[in-house]
Amino acid sequence: MNKEQMYAACEFDSEGNLLWAGGTAEKPWIVSTYNAGILNKDWVGGKSAKQADIFRKLNGLDSHMSPKAQEIIDSLKNQPLHVIAENQFAVTDYAYQLFIAPLLPELRKFLDRNILDLQNNESFSTAEKNCQDLIRKVDFSTEFVEAVRVAFEWLDKKNPNVPRAVRSTAPSEDGGEFSGSGKYSTKLRQFGFEEVLNAIKACFVSRFNRGALHYQFSAPHAFGEDLASLSFAVMVQDMQPSIDVAGTIFTADTQSNHPGFVEINFTYGLGEAVVSGRVSSDSWIFAKRPLRLKKDGLIDFKLGEKQEYFDGEWHKNTPENSAKKCMSDETASTLSTIGMLLGDLFRELDVESVESDLEAAINFKTNTIIITQQRAITTLKHEPVHRKFTLDGLNEDGQENATLESTLLLKSKGINAGIPSITHGVVISLFGEGAEFKRDFEKKFNEKKKQITDKYGDKIGVILVTAMTYPWMEPSMEQTVACITTRGGKNDHTPIWCKEHGLPCAVSVKGAPEFLKDGSLITYYGVGDTPAFYEGRHQYSVTETQLEGLKPSPIPIRLIVSDASTARSVCMRSYFPSLNIGRGSGLVRWEMLAAKLRVHPMAVMNHSTLESDFLQLVGQGRMTKEEAVKTAESVAEFIRTEAGELSPVDWYVKALAREIAGIVSPYYTDDINEPMVVRLPDFKTNEHADLLGGRAYEPVEENPMLGDRGAGKYLGAYQKAFLAIDLKALAYVINDMGYTNIHIEVPFVRTPDEMKEVARLVKESGINIPLQMMFELPVNISRATEFFKVSDGGQIGSNDLLQLEFGLDRSGGDILPWHIQHLQSRIENLIQERNTTKPEFHLGLCGNLPSTNPEFAKWLVDAGIDEFSVTPDALIPALLGVIRETPDGKQNITVYTAEGEVFVNGQKA
């Protein structure tokens, strides 16, 4: 084809921008960002279409935008970082189908569903080799090569001599349920026409990777019967010559699936280091609601090891760079805002759009953020099912009994990143790298699995332990009950694949090769943030309650919560507003949040005088001088290390604020606004003394349960000082982070004057929100009218009230039915007094009784309580106790045991 003929098969606009090349305008082989046809994902795949959409909107190429979309674009343009999407052209599915058409008869033979077998990995390896060898032998047509040349020369003229990214994009897999992520080829930093052309061919070849074939074969309802002719496309993008940091932005918390958050995973160099899972990246989580209010939205940060970086080649990172954040919290906040706005934009443009998985990079020299990819998050599900996980020997607070603890192999700093679950299995440990490891992996896996089956039969599954997983491992991963990796993060191949396939997994598990030995039988507890592994086969059960058709509770049933790290997961498992359950919290335990910081607030405030404070204990006979000096220096060093560049007080305030915000943020989002009752610290003196530095400031009491605690403790001379620092943290959460769904609760109020004085201190700290109190002392009941006057609401603390009414040990076994009956009469008296004297006074209850006794929960409703709170595991039993009926008279509860037995509504299935 001569130049005149070649240029006849393309079209440019009046400003010299390529519209299409090759084929025809109706069925082009190549389209550019300046052609609206590139927005057709059936032509170019969702990945390419969405990238082009961002480019067109940021560059003013779309004149027909809704006012909301234009507002979002304007907000993106006003960010501290300049937001761009790189120019690109796309090789369409038309071009791919023309290339593949002559090969289809042979390809269909290789991909015959009568030959492929999900249980036979070798069948997919053979199909991969046969298909790819066939494609490699076929040259591109002259016409196609020239069309690519036209597109490349146009792209290079607009941005000369920069590297290009050549990415596969599969129209059939870029939806909200199925993802082609990681299954096909991506070639980064390609220079010149020949490298780009060869990279396009490599992408075509990768269409038949065995991981992709296995994935498609296992879902015929999505991909059809003919695997040979599935749609496929390739995008060719400009790249920045220099990238400082890169990674992923998810517009939902991927661990809990909560849509109210943005998750950032970034490292030095190109984003391949994060996406592949090869590097443990820095990770930030921001709440969207504060970001929308232009307030501090940072909820959590975890420093990654960042062992290596990738700039086209892999390099070892310096210890200095590994030990520090790859970017500031302020930059991460800007990234989160940009990601949130882009998610808003995609939902505005497509009402069926789900939350977004974005890849981005930053060039600090040009103050530019480059959005390199966007796809749907495929793992977001919120079923009307409540699951309760029970492991023998583990209580509701996550504490192990002696028997279970004796078998603990590893409780890792790694991350549970798959489906929450408990499982047991025999370890298959496979480590290595390079072509030889890839070649032998499947064979070794099958050999080990056969040995396990021969020994244990089919009732014991296998748990894969490896450095990281890849799409080519998927046929083997299909045969596991869990996957454990020593590298990677929450959003690389392992967790994405495991979530899509309903499996638990843990990533970045240090020590796994040492403690999880090949061939050993283990139990994996994959619930919550941190994975735990136990030797042997422990009994467990998973209880599933179907919620569809259940009647709602007549009053709100809220939660008792105390762990910021699991709050988002608890919310997503328990928040069902249509049933009036899981609606915020009637008790957030401050002391458990503060204990995460490990240090007494007075030690933080007195960090410069710790030695003299501890030396006072010498005169009291509580320490030797040597112990006092050594302890003071140890506490001071801890505070210095944790505070870093901040002052100790600023560090403490910010860290405590993050813990509080971590609890309340899941319940204050774009779509959720539920009250969170935060109880001010109720440390007993012995508990407070256990914190670092606490012995210097806490007295030794014979009975801390009845000693210096609650409201009275805040009013001592030095206690007012540390209450001030605690209130400063709370004020930051309310005023600087914007969480106005918080209510404050004061514990252990002995007199109305105590309540008034605490209220004054709270107001002086800049906090102006409702102030409740705990009704947990007998005097709170007998003098209720006086306490109603000094409080904006209250929660009955049934644990302490029961203990103090009868002088009982509330955790002992000597509580009788008569005690409960008397307690009920006291609660009835309080409710009646409220109804008579101050009917608008909101009264709830939190304590063990409704959590452990559904009958008591029902009684509370009948007695006229406004709400009550239970532990998350007790939520559904409490609901069933309250409504007293279920669909068709059945509770619709299924229990799965460790032995593989299934019980439905108490009957063995």
Spans of model-derived segments:
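Beta-sheet entry/capping signal
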Residues: 82-90, 163-164, 233, 247, ...
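N-terminal beta-alpha lobe that positions the nucleotide/phosphoryl donor
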Residues: 1-235, 244, 323-330, 335, ...
